[in-house]
């Protein structure tokens, strides 16, 4: 049986640092008009995205929680399964402790002021702002991934530690809200180079055909 595995479908999660460092944020969207449609194209300038800077080596973690409930009959058999909840969250650790845009996400829009080299942050009970956020990922072998949340809000921030042996960082968990029934978009541009395919599949067949043609050419040369 032919080996139909395809390395074009194998992706890594490295950041595309050429795309604003790999992560950008902007105002939350209210409709899908300006949603991205191509992992290789820049976001619409109308989204007003700016760089969010360095993130930790843990990258970005997506969690999809789909809670269900089994409805059973008198005999204890499952009759139907209902869905009671669905949520999408993102977790990322920001490493730029003085990045104003990041601080506004985790402390509040009106609680951060930047004047020259001075950044002032106030912690209070203000509701945190909603933002759109994009992650640009280099999938390897020329492939690209764009993960885009049109409306996300930070719901939890980890402890901030000030020590000599580490940088000041903010671990943020964000809830993704639906915009036109879309909470999160993942766009994938696969590698175009057929050389990354596994040996023995369709490419293997092509190689065998090429080998047969080469053999025929050699035989013809010997006959001449």
Please name every model-derived segment:
Residues 1-51, 203, 213, 218-220:
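Polar/acidic, low-complexity leader/linker segments enriched in S/T/G and N/D
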Residues 80-100, 165-180:
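Oligomerization/assembly interface segments of phage tail-like spikes and tubes
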């Amino acid at each position: 049986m032919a080996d139909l595995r395809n390395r074009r479908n194998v992706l890594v999660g490295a950041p595309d640092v050429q795309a604003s460092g790999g992560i950008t944020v902007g105002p939350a969207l209210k409709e899908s008009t300006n949603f991205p449609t191509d992992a290789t194209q820049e976001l619409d300038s109308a989204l007003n995205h700016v760089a969010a800077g360095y993130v930790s080596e843990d990258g970005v973690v997506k969690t999809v929680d789909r809670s269900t409930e089994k409805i059973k009959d008198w005999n204890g058999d499952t009759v139907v399964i209902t869905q009671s909840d669905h949520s999408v969250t993102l977790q990322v650790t920001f490493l730029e402790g003085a990045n104003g845009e990041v601080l506004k996400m985790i402390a509040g829009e009106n609680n951060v002021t930047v004047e020259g080299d001075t950044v002032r942050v106030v912690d209070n009970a203000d509701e945190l702002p909603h933002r759109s956020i994009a992650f640009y990922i280099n999938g390897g072998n020329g492939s690209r991934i764009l993960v885009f949340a049109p409306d996300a809000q930070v719901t939890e921030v980890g402890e901030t530690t000030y020590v000599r042996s580490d940088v000041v960082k903010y671990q943020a968990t964000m809830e993704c809200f639906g915009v036109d029934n879309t909470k999160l978009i993942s766009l994938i541009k696969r590698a175009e180079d057929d050389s990354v395919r596994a040996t023995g599949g369709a490419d293997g067949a092509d190689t065998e055909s090429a080998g047969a043609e080469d053999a025929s050419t050699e035989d013809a040369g010997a006959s001449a």
